[in-house]
């Protein structure tokens, strides 16, 4: 086995997965990983059982909105299993030889983390399914009458697949995962714990009220909380403040155009477009996305989960619809027929 707990990034394209500037804030063990309690408890049991049997951990499927810690958790799993980990994403696999090179280079009980696993090409996915189940690879050498199939044995490895779109993962691939976990948006209390922990790492003194205000504006997402914490640190430094207060956080949020509900300018653009251009809806996600200059994927993956969680948008079988809360938040008057329709949808 190679160096235990080593992290290997398979291409420079993975920088978005594991930003070095964020590395110092990433928890390394379960104890420091805040939130996702059920996910942690379940994985801890399976990891302990695998270690006691001396076996590789079963394949793990992680799903949920971006920025919630799926990549971080994969690294923690590797640490807890005393295993090396290779981190990559599905678009990095262009040809069969790409996946063959990676799989044959794995160590016994090591971990391969593939982000955006729903984007695997069909031929790559087929090869990966065989590797996950049989720990073998069939590789065709030559062409025509001279073609022959070579079977290559693989070490017992663990694949951790992550996606923001579990519905786009094919049934054959999903069935190969023995452990599945869904990440949910974090509560304010959980984000406050993360902010307090990371403020210590960044050598920032932050008041309790300030931490809560920052958490409330982080869209239930640790990645956003960390980014905002860094920007608030900049403001405190420039203003000569030794302590981050709620006033400093308020100044920073105003500069970043983030309101008291954690909505940024694009969130408000989405709600305005839904209300003013489409009379509050319902409207299809593709049409709504075009109206605000976004892709349907970015609207569904990044913006909608938080807007739905906060009660600004309802997702119906006819499309997206603004709630009464959205009208109130933007100080827009709701028509009588829209009030009746919203009450009917809510009921």
UniProtKB/Swiss-Prot annotation:
GO terms for cellular component: cytoplasm; Holliday junction resolvase complex. It holds the Pfam family AAA_lid_4. DNA binds at residues 315, 320. Residues 187-257 are annotated as: Small ATPAse domain (RuvB-S). InterPro entries: AAA+_ATPase (IPR003593), AAA_lid_4 (IPR041445), DNA_helicase_Holl-junc_RuvB (IPR004605), P-loop_NTPase (IPR027417), RuvB-like_N (IPR008824), RuvB_C (IPR008823), WH-like_DNA-bd_sf (IPR036388), WH_DNA-bd_sf (IPR036390). CDD domains: AAA. Residues 260-347 are annotated as: Head domain (RuvB-H). Its EC number is 3.6.4.-. Keywords: ATP-binding, Cytoplasm, DNA damage, DNA recombination, DNA repair, DNA-binding, Hydrolase, Nucleotide-binding. It is found in: Cytoplasm. Residues 1-186 are annotated as: Large ATPase domain (RuvB-L). The RuvA-RuvB-RuvC complex processes Holliday junction (HJ) DNA during genetic recombination and DNA repair, while the RuvA-RuvB complex plays an important role in the rescue of blocked DNA replication forks via replication fork reversal (RFR). RuvA specifically binds to HJ cruciform DNA, conferring on it an open structure. The RuvB hexamer acts as an ATP-dependent pump, pulling dsDNA into and through the RuvAB complex. RuvB forms 2 homohexamers on either side of HJ DNA bound by 1 or 2 RuvA tetramers; 4 subunits per hexamer contact DNA at a time. Homohexamer. Forms an RuvA(8)-RuvB(12)-Holliday junction (HJ) complex. HJ DNA is sandwiched between 2 RuvA tetramers; dsDNA enters through RuvA and exits via RuvB. An RuvB hexamer assembles on each DNA strand where it exits the tetramer. Each RuvB hexamer is contacted by two RuvA subunits (via domain III) on 2 adjacent RuvB subunits; this complex drives branch migration. In the full resolvosome a probable DNA-RuvA(4)-RuvB(12)-RuvC(2) complex forms which resolves the HJ. This is Holliday junction branch migration complex subunit RuvB. It comes from Borrelia garinii subsp. bavariensis (strain ATCC BAA-2496 / DSM 23469 / PBi) (Borreliella bavariensis). The gene is ruvB.
